[in-house]
Amino acid sequence: MDFSIKGCDWSKGEAKGFLTGKSDCIVLGIFEAQTLSGAALDIDTATKGLISRVVKAGDMDGKRGKTLFLPEVSGIGASRVLLVGLGKQDAFNQKAYNDAATAAWRALLATKVVQVTFSLAQLPVDERSSDWGVRAAILALRNETYRFTQMKSKPEPASHTLKRVVFSVDPADEKAAKVAIKQAVALANGMDLTRDLGNLPGNVCTPTYLGNTAKKIAKDWGLKAEVLGLKQIQALKMGSFLSVARASVEPPQFIVLHYQGAAAKAAPVVLVGKGITFDTGGISLKPGEGMDEMKYDMCGAGSVLGTIRAVAEMGLKINVVAIVPTCENMPGGNATKPGDIVTSMKGLTIEVLNTDAEGRLILCDALTYAERFKPAAVIDVATLTGACVIALGGHNSGLFSTNDALAGELLDASREANDPAWRMPLDDEYQDQLKSNFADLANIGGRPAGAVTAACFLSRFTESYPWAHLDIAGTAWKGGAAKGATGRPVPLLAQFLIDRAGQ
């Protein structure tokens, strides 16, 4: 799909190109109380009051997400107009903008339009510039066009005909908007990879498959890839990681991807993704109902791979290392048992009270491994706890950090990227719940504050660098009729890295 930019100040009568330029459809916004947006006012004048008459007749009330096509419109180059309800003008925020953009794309994709002019990016949204609107609109479009059909005997072809979108932006934002297109396409490609990996079944997306995916990313984008096998993991003394992997016939992999966009001496940001490609719970077996969704337990790994792919396509001037410990968590005669004690790469001994709290067991060794890069920051991403879902639901990812500055950067990025996160507590008092009579610490701290104690466990392995943890158990995938991986938190992570790179 082709995206382009055209500067236009509707308030100064600069809309001639849009009024005469050929297009299948122009998208206009209408607020409640019959208020026309700037672009809609110009088109209304060119069409001799058509938009006003439609609104006055009650055919378009401006309620958020409502759409109305006006066919065969005379006086402008576009053959039709799509009116999109924006809701109340004084409540028009980022969510309202995304709702409007999504509604517009859904309506357009159901038609045979090929070229569209999109004016909504210029709407005032929480002090964001129109280049922000361009990026958000492209991501909304790519979200609507994403389909996962490759596992069907007859994959479904794309049902839409849309090929070209022209965005009108404020003239001062033209240069930034062109950058926004590049970033949005790269980000959408990274999200698609993340979603594909999450949606693949566990018998396809194995640890070996993730390793091969990392190698392909490295080959396609000029990254350096290291994929360590069982013997190398054993040599590193990753006893905690291996305690999870031991009962599966699928060999574990320890994946490291290096992206160098800055000077070699510049400290990298390290992203660590939990890669449990299927989680039965091990000996602490999960209930059978809904266990199919445990293929999504590698979405942390998928988001890290999707992010570094997006970063490489954007060409960000920053160094990034992606680390993915990946294995299955299976029951078996040689599986780790509740009460077993294992030794982590750091040397801390861990009493495994519940084998279904396995994500932290593979992450802790990866977090120790990250020390060798002398990182500027380390962010781990994991579908870690059901407790986080209970606390935050499916809207916000849980953010935990021992570093206020890093947490602030991530929260700013989450707001900019429309990928919400909520900071959770990480007080020292919670550490007491991890005490063990027999080892240095236990892998669970009981039911109270389960998401917090999981993060506390990880914090024991992160003392040498700024660290944050994203619990995406509630945001990595959706159930029900819209079942599937979401691609989150790739937008948050990518925006954080864009900000760090100053781009």
UniProtKB/Swiss-Prot annotation:
Cofactor: Mn(2+)
InterPro entries in UniProt: Leucine_aapep/pepB (IPR011356), Macro_dom-like (IPR043472), Peptidase_M17_C (IPR000819), Peptidase_M17_leu_NH2_pept (IPR023042), Peptidase_M17_N (IPR008283)
Main localisation: cytoplasm
CDD domains for the chain: Peptidase_M17 (cd00433)
GO molecular function annotation: manganese ion binding; metalloaminopeptidase activity
Compartment list: Cytoplasm
Pfam families: Peptidase_M17 (PF00883), Peptidase_M17_N (PF02789)
Cofactor binding, per record: Binds 2 manganese ions per subunit.
EC main group: hydrolase
Family matches, as Gene3D superfamilies: Leucine Aminopeptidase, subunit E, domain 1 (3.40.220.10), Zn peptidases (3.40.630.10)
Binding sites annotated in the UniProt record for Mn(2+) 2: K274, D279, D297, E358
An individual GO BP term: proteolysis
E.C. numbers: 3.4.11.1, 3.4.11.10
UniProt record similarity statement: Belongs to the peptidase M17 family.
Protein name, entry field: Probable cytosol aminopeptidase
Organism from which the protein derives: Burkholderia orbicola (strain MC0-3)
Lineage of origin: Bacteria, Pseudomonadati, Pseudomonadota, Betaproteobacteria, Burkholderiales
